[in-house]
Amino acid sequence: MQKRRNIIRGLRWAKALQDKPRFISSPRIKGIQRAGLIYENRIANYIKALYGDKVIHGQWYEYEDRRGLGWCQPDILILPDKSRDFLLVIECKLKATRKAWVQLNYLYRPVLEKIYPQVDLRMVQVVKNLDKNLKLDLIDTLDDVFCQEKKFEYSTLFLRNLT
């Protein structure tokens, strides 16, 4: 199996998969990774309760770029509807990180632009803990993410508690 890549170069095609690729195992996750997955699932359930069937959690995608085949799985997508003309891509992290920006913009963005060519994308890192050393464009509430007047391509939402 080839090494994971976070940057796509020369994307040729991309498609959504019905299931997780067979060769990707489901190991028993422990520690900080488990805590991160629990946080992601909480965020996904919260967003599904608000936005229903427009929410896609854990969708796998296959793509081919100059380096060959690759696979990726954005945490959460919220599809456009009558009141919202953009696709929202959410990456959940326990702690704010620059890695999320790279993942969202150089891995997920090219794949999703290929699959949804007529739709604008908004990328959001949802975090449980902030890093005071990172300069972040913060959004105050989940409602601000969906506000048509606030134009942005990438931002961070601090969601410690879901109440």
Question: How does the language model describe each region?
Answer:
Residues 1-51:
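Interdomain/boundary linker segments immediately adjacent to catalytic/signaling cores
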Residues 35-40, 68-69, 99-104:
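Phosphate/oxyanion-binding active-site loops and adjacent basic polyanion-contact surfaces
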Residues 40-43, 47, 55, 75-78, ...:
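Hydrophobic beta-strand residues in large extracellular and virion-surface proteins
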Residues 2-14, 119-163:
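Domain-level recognition of nuclease-like catalytic cores that cleave nucleotide substrates
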Residues 31-32, 46-84:
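Active-site metal-binding core of divalent-cation-utilizing nuclease and nuclease-like domains
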Residues 88, 93-102, 106-144:
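Nucleic-acid nuclease catalytic cores
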Residues 26-31, 69, 91-92:
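Short coil/turn segments at secondary-structure junctions
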